Each structure stands twice: as C-alpha cells, then as structure tokens.
Swiss-Prot record:
Gene (UniProt): uppS
List of catalytic residues: 26, 74
Protein name as annotated: Ditrans,polycis-undecaprenyl-diphosphate synthase ((2E,6E)-farnesyl-diphosphate specific)
Positions annotated to bind Mg(2+): 26, 213
Residues that, per the record, bind substrate: 27-31, 39, 43, 71-73, 75, 77, 194, 200-202
C-alpha cells in the first residue's frame, strides 16, 4: 500500500483516536535504582507495563502499537544486562503466545534479529507465524532496531532491484523508500510517546514519524498505566495536525 495513500488516510482521521501509536519505553533502569533494586528488576516490571499498554490499545480500538524494546545501540550495555533482557524477551514470548492468539493480536518484530541466539529467533518466527492471520491489534516489537538501519536496508533493496533491471532509477520516490522499510504495510505513526523524561527520538522510526505528534512524560516506563496512556491520547486528539499545511482559520 502506498505511503501517500496511507498518509491521506491519517489526514482524514486525524480528529479521531490515533491509529498507530509508537512508544519509546524509557526509564526501567532508573526505576529499579530508585527502588533500591538491580536494573533487571526494572525491565521485569516494565514487562507488566507492556501488558497494560496492550490491553489499553485493544480496549480503545487502536490498530497498531509499536514498542521500542531494544535498540541497535543497546548492545553497549553490560553483558549481564543484555543476557537478562534476551531471557526476558524469550520468557515473554513463551508465556504470552496464548494471549496473543486469544485476543486476536498479530505479532511482528522489526529489526535485525540475526544477532539473537537461535532459540530466541525461533520463538520470534513461531509467534509471527502463528499470529499472522489474526485481524486485531498489530503489535510491533522493535528489537535490535535503529531508524538509520531501517532506511539503509530499504536503500539496499532498492539498489538491488535497480541493478537487476526491475526498477527504473528515475521512478524512485518517497513511496519507494517506504515500501521497503520494515513497516512497509502499516499505517504511518500518528503518535509517539516517550516515557522517562527525556525529549529525544533516539534513532526510532526516523522515516515513519515525519508527521507524527510527539508526547513526552516524566513517568518512568514501569509506572506507565492506562491513565497516562489516555492522557497522551487526549493530548493527541486536542491538537491540530497540519501535515505541512496551515491552520484552518488562517487565510
């Protein structure tokens, strides 16, 4: 589906609840430190917040929820923390697969998962396959993901098609780039929420959030709940999205 068409769809529905919400889940480590606990306990409590966000998304008829779980820069963290995160990811997949099916959720991972061990890769593939035909909420987990990586991979695929004579270089446009991104078949992101008090994007969905509304909260991710999610939605609905245009009351 062409990005231009999808963006037009968002424009027509911009006064309603967002269709696609993306969340930068920040603050797990700080939450644990404030509680006098080790960092991994913050990540475990953050898993509870993930389930809350999913429940809210279903209850409010959101079409797509994308969660930034592990960036390509997170490999710079201590090895024991990375190991614990991978184990938590595997545990979440193994324990929640029934709920994904029960609630008609389509599960998808965006990012380079080839760096993960085979057991985790197999669990990801299984979860994606078994939920592929589900028609409810689309749940994207960005794992070993970076916005620059996503764009580079898209460009590589385009170059390959040009070299093979499948694509005319003079017919490359914005829609072409979007078509080969990891989110190619999805609606553009309407709303980006970042928890933890920082006000930056951190290499997340750089192409896809060109016209997104941004919502920042000081709440640390483990403390995120349906009330905070609703506040972000209310903020989104109250805004006038211009998509590069001007205010309606201006002449």
């Amino acid at each position: 589906m062409q990005y231009k068409y999808l963006l037009e769809y968002n424009k027509k529905n911009h006064e309603c609840n967002p269709c696609h919400v993306a969340i930068i889940m920040d603050g797990n480590g700080r939450w644990a430190t404030r509680q006098g606990k080790i960092r991994i306990m913050g990540h475990k409590e953050g898993f509870r917040a993930v389930k809350e966000a999913i429940k809210f998304s279903i209850a409010n008829n959101l079409k797509i929820l994308t969660l930034y779980a592990f960036s390509s820069e997170n490999w710079n963290r201590p090895l024991f923390e990375i190991k614990a995160l991978m184990e938590l990811f595997l545990f979440a997949l193994d324990t929640e697969i029934k709920n994904l099916k029960k609630h008609n959720i389509r599960f998808k991972v965006i990012g380079d998962i080839t760096c993960f061990d085979k057991k985790l890769q197999n669990s990801i593939h299984y979860a994606e396959q078994i939920t592929f035909d589900n028609t409810g909420l689309i749940l994207n987990i960005a794992a070993n993901y970076g916005g620059r990586w996503d764009i580079i991979e898209s460009v590589k695929k385009i170059i390959n098609r040009v070299q093979r004579g499948i694509l005319d270089v003079n017919k490359i446009h914005e829609n072409t780039i979007s078509q080969y991104l990891s989110t190619s078949e999805l609606l553009p992101v309407d709303l980006v929420i970042r928890t933890g008090g920082e006000k930056r994007i951190s290499n997340f969905l750089l192409w896809q959030i060109a016209y997104s509304e941004l919502y920042f909260t000081d709440v640390l991710w483990p403390d995120f709940n349906c009330h905070i999610f609703q506040h972000a939605i209310d903020s989104f609905v109250s805004r006038e999205r211009r998509f590069g245009g001007f205010k309606k009351n201006k002449k």
